């Protein structure tokens, strides 16, 4: 089948040389859009499905020395702040993004998200074929929720496999079941987030209940039993950082012998991007005690044994 390069998706980053998002050395393609609104999200720029204008004031050379962005914005959404840096009025900004960011010589204004074709993305991915061959790596789709852009994600996976590239997806599972079934035959590996087994608690911190997430996990595990799955739980203070929550997830996973499990300690690496987007950091200054994570690792090990992976 010929590649239809008219198939496009909204991509906000392509990251090379990753060793934490699937086996071997991988290239991660980040797609925009997610149905969940997790308070701890480290990629806030991934949540909306459209391109977004952001401001990194540390790169701005000062409005008084430049000011191109003030006149470039067709909506009058950019003004000069007291610190001589741009201020974006989000109530007026249409996220057309391009005029303001294009005229910024220092990249103080930047755009998260760009329409890219399947072939364009895979040309970047193919640059590291030698690394994939030696390490067992390949392409990982991430986000956001990559399967929310269902047809584009499946087209990427299908074409990657046709080019002998191993494929993986990082998913929260909050997508239509048909999309899961369509993507699965083109996957070599799945990283699947299970955040909480209690649907009401899940909804308080992510915005949605978990029934669809758990059902899609069952679909993958039962209908595609030869597909390796790594279930992952981000350990979040005040949400699931307790033995009861982790034990419930581990017991759920135990029914599927080909599924491994990993706990991901909470971190604050994405906080700066919230500021770039003019948003408050939902989690504030909270942190996770390492002793808590170590205790929860033991809880998981007691239930799943060697199927528990310790983060590198």
Curated annotation (Swiss-Prot):
InterPro entries in UniProt: 4Fe4S_Fe-S-bd (IPR017896), BssD/PflA/YjjW (IPR040074), Organic_radical-activating (IPR034457), Organic_radical_activase (IPR012839), Radical_activat_CS (IPR001989), rSAM (IPR007197)
Domain of life of the organism encoding this protein? Bacteria
Native organism is: Desulfovibrio desulfuricans (strain ATCC 27774 / DSM 6949 / MB)
Name the cofactor(s): [4Fe-4S] cluster
Q: Which gene encodes it?
A: islB
- 4Fe-4S: present as a keyword of the record? yes
List positions binding [4Fe-4S] cluster 2.
60, 66, 69, 104
Task: Supply the Gene3D superfamilies for this chain.
Answer: 3.30.70.20, pyruvate-formate lyase- activating enzyme
Descriptive protein name = Isethionate sulfite-lyase activating enzyme
Give the function comment from the record: Involved in an anaerobic respiration pathway that converts the sulfonate isethionate (2-hydroxyethanesulfonate) to ammonia, acetate and sulfide. Catalyzes activation of the isethionate sulfite-lyase IslA under anaerobic conditions by generation of an organic free radical on a glycine residue, via a homolytic cleavage of S-adenosyl-L-methionine (SAM).
Q: Which GO terms describe its biological process?
A: alkanesulfonate catabolic process
């Amino acid at each position: 089948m010929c590649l239809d390069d008219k198939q496009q998706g909204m991509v906000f980053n392509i990251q090379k040389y990753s060793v934490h998002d699937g086996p071997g050395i991988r290239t991660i393609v980040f797609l925009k859009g997610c149905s969940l609104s997790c308070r701890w999200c480290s990629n806030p720029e991934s949540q909306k499905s459209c391109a977004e204008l952001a401001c990194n004031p540390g790169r701005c050379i000062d409005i008084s020395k430049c000011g191109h962005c003030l006149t470039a914005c067709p909506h009058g959404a950019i003004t000069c702040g007291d610190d001589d840096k741009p201020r974006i009025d989000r109530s007026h900004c249409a996220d057309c993004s391009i005029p303001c960011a294009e005229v910024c010589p220092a990249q103080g204004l930047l755009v998260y998200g760009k329409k890219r074709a399947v072939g364009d993305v895979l040309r970047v991915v193919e640059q590291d074929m030698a690394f994939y061959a030696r390490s067992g790596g390949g392409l990982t789709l991430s986000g956001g929720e990559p399967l929310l852009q269902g047809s584009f994600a499946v087209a990427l996976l299908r074409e990657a496999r046709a080019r002998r590239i191993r494929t993986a997806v990082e998913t929260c599972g909050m997508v239509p079941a048909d999309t899961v079934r369509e993507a699965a035959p083109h996957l070599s590996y799945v990283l699947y987030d299970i955040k909480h087994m209690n649907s009401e608690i899940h909804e308080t911190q992510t915005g949605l209940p978990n029934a669809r997430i758990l059902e899609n996990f069952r679909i993958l595990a039962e209908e595609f039993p030869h597909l390796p799955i790594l279930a992952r739980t981000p350990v979040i203070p005040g949400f699931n950082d307790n033995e009861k929550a982790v034990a419930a997830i581990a017991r759920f996973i135990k029914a599927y012998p080909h599924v491994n499990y990993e706990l991901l300690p909470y971190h604050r690496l994405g906080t700066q991007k919230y500021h770039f987007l003019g948003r408050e950091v939902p989690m504030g200054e909270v942190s996770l005690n390492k002793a808590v994570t170590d205790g929860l690792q033991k809880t998981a090990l007691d239930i799943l044994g060697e199927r528990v992976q310790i983060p590198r």
